[in-house]
Amino acid sequence: MPSISININLAFATALLGMLMFRSHMMSSLLCLEGMMLSMFILSTLTILNMQFTMSFTMPILLLVFAACEAAIGLALLVMVSNNYGLDYIQNLNLLQC
């Protein structure tokens, strides 16, 4: 396994660990989720370029589109929660209340 793949897998694991450790703040969770998506994008792009499989060149673009949609929805949710409650602590929110 080349060293670049090890570094990207380490970046994914670090972002996943950050997601598990800092899950009380919504902004930290969103940043860790973006880090995971970025490392998945880079790893899938490198894998496809190394395999030279021309039919799957659209897979990294599709992953990038999903990451952009996830970021937009996450930021909209963060703005909504911040406007309604004044903070982004997930543990203090009861989203089931009207």
Swiss-Prot record:
Subcellular location field: Mitochondrion inner membrane
GO molecular function, one term: NADH dehydrogenase (ubiquinone) activity
Keyword Oxidoreductase tagged: no
Main enzyme class: translocase
Gene Ontology cellular component terms for the protein in this record: mitochondrial inner membrane; respiratory chain complex I
A Pfam entry, by short name: Oxidored_q2
Disulfide bonds: none
Transmembrane found in the keyword field: yes
Source species, domain of life: Eukaryota
Positions in coiled-coil regions: none
Keywords assigned by UniProt, alphabetized: Electron transport, Membrane, Mitochondrion, Mitochondrion inner membrane, NAD, Respiratory chain, Translocase, Transmembrane, Transmembrane helix, Transport, Ubiquinone
EC number(s) per entry: 7.1.1.2
Residues that span the membrane, as ranges: 2-22, 29-49, 61-81
Topology within the bilayer: Multi-pass membrane protein
Catalysed reactions, semicolon-separated: a ubiquinone + NADH + 5 H(+)(in) = a ubiquinol + NAD(+) + 4 H(+)(out)
Database matches in InterPro entries: NADH_UbQ_OxRdtase_chain4L/K (IPR001133), NUOK/Mnh_C1-like (IPR039428)
Main location group: mitochondrion
GO biological process: ATP synthesis coupled electron transport
Subunit and partners: Core subunit of respiratory chain NADH dehydrogenase (Complex I) which is composed of 45 different subunits.
Role played: Core subunit of the mitochondrial membrane respiratory chain NADH dehydrogenase (Complex I) which catalyzes electron transfer from NADH through the respiratory chain, using ubiquinone as an electron acceptor. Part of the enzyme membrane arm which is embedded in the lipid bilayer and involved in proton translocation.
Similarity field: Belongs to the complex I subunit 4L family.
Stated name of the protein: NADH-ubiquinone oxidoreductase chain 4L
Provenance organism: Microcebus simmonsi
Gene name of the record: MT-ND4L
